[in-house]
């Protein structure tokens, strides 16, 4: 049976399993009606994902739904926000009901995990793409931003950057990894990144600045440097790598992917000396490693990379959709 737009929405996307109290009216009308809790600031982010640009055209729909939501959740994590609502505008080349069922099941699994509600969106026909709008709350005056770093702050990253780029290389047959367990781990880091929501919430009163690593450490830390009007000195020997990555690529390739590979969706943040002890306590029990890789400074401009105590020049750049090849 043919599935039209409204029956498609009703069948696959209008299936609220638990309504949030702050949603007065969700899917099914011209607008959603929403209530912002008292003494909370609304945090909003929007991402567009296009087949062949942001994801491989043959990606499993369950992985696509997970990643599409996870990368938006990562934006909320970088602000220290609590997830709340999602809008989804989905463009499909045709109606494949098996594809839609897999996509929507995965999407709602992750929505329910974070106690979120899909509140609206749109569907249309065309090349596969989607735009997600995510909304969350952060207590007034406690949001993390890119512009708060100060000279003397210590620079940290969560997790092990570079894994996602390696996973993509495996999927594109640019990297051969014979160990199935390592290959699966690296591919999963690309297809199903872990938004660091709990870490972002814990950093609200500890970090001066934060950003999620979507385009690579060079690019994303560069945003903090620019917004905060100070420099950053990074010791390359301190960058953390996963065992799975280190076992299968030479150190220089691991370094390149960690700095410029992108799509890790870890957090990079800066913490004043006074808060380092509290940071160890706050993040230490969350099960995700976090590593100090350098320090913000007033005596240099931009990013300075150190190897064996000496400055080194790197010509790598983070991902840029409009960069000239």
UniProtKB/Swiss-Prot annotation:
Binding site for substrate: 54, 263, 319
Any matching Pfam family: AIRS_C
Keyword Transferase: yes
InterPro entries, sorted: PurM-like_C_dom, PurM-like_C_sf, PurM-like_N, PurM-like_N_sf, ThiL-like
Chemical reaction(s) catalysed: thiamine phosphate + ATP = thiamine diphosphate + ADP
GO terms, biological process: thiamine biosynthetic process; thiamine diphosphate biosynthetic process
Positions that bind ATP: 121-122, 146, 214
Protein residues bound to Mg(2+) 1: 46-47, 122
Positions bound to Mg(2+) 4: 30, 45, 75
Binding site for Mg(2+) 5: 215
UniProt keywords, alphabetically: ATP-binding, Kinase, Magnesium, Metal-binding, Nucleotide-binding, Thiamine biosynthesis, Transferase
Class in the EC hierarchy, top level: transferase
EC number: 2.7.4.16
Gene3D superfamilies given in the database record: PurM-like C-terminal domain, PurM-like, N-terminal domain
Signal peptide start-end: none
GO molecular function, one term: ATP binding
Family, as annotated: Belongs to the thiamine-monophosphate kinase family.
Task of the protein: Catalyzes the ATP-dependent phosphorylation of thiamine-monophosphate (TMP) to form thiamine-pyrophosphate (TPP), the active form of vitamin B1.
HAMAP family from the UniProt entry: TMP_kinase
Anything else known: Reaction mechanism of ThiL seems to utilize a direct, inline transfer of the gamma-phosphate of ATP to TMP rather than a phosphorylated enzyme intermediate.
PANTHER family linked: THIAMINE-MONOPHOSPHATE KINASE
Protein's name according to its UniProt entry: Thiamine-monophosphate kinase
């Amino acid at each position: 049976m043919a599935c039209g737009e409204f029956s498609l929405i009703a069948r696959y996307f209008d299936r609220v399993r638990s309504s949030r109290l702050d949603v007065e009216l969700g899917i099914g009308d011209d607008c959603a009606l929403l209530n912002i809790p008292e003494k909370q600031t609304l945090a909003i982010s929007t991402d567009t994902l296009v087949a062949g640009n942001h994801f491989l055209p043959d990606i499993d729909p369950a992985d696509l739904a997970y990643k599409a939501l996870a990368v938006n959740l990562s934006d909320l994590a970088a602000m220290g926000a609590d997830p709340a609502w999602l809008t989804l505008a989905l463009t499909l080349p045709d109606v494949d009901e098996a594809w839609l069922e897999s996509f929507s099941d995965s999407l709602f699994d992750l929505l329910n995990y974070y106690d979120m509600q899909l509140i609206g969106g749109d569907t249309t026909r065309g090349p596969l793409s989607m735009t997600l709008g995510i909304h969350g709350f952060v207590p007034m005056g406690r949001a993390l931003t890119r512009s708060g770093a100060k000279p003397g702050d210590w620079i940290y990253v969560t997790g092990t950057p570079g894994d996602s780029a390696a996973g993509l290389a495996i999927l594109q047959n640019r990297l051969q990894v014979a160990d199935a367990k390592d290959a699966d781990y690296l591919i999963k880091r690309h297809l199903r990144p872990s938004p660091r929501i709990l870490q972002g919430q814990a950093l609200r009163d500890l970090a001066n600045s934060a950003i999620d690593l979507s385009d690579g450490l060079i690019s994303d830390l560069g945003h903090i440097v620019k917004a905060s009007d100070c420099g950053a000195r990074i010791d390359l020997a301190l960058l953390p790598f996963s065992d799975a990555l280190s076992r299968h690529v030479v150190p220089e390739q691991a370094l390149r992917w960690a700095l410029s590979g992108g799509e890790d969706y870890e957090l990079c943040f800066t913490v004043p000396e006074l808060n380092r002890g509290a940071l160890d306590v706050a993040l230490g029990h969350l099960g995700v490693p976090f590593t100090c890789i350098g320090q913000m400074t007033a005596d240099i401009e931009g990013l300075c990379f150190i190897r064996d105590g000496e400055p080194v020049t790197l010509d790598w750049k983070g991902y840029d959709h409009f960069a000239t090849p």
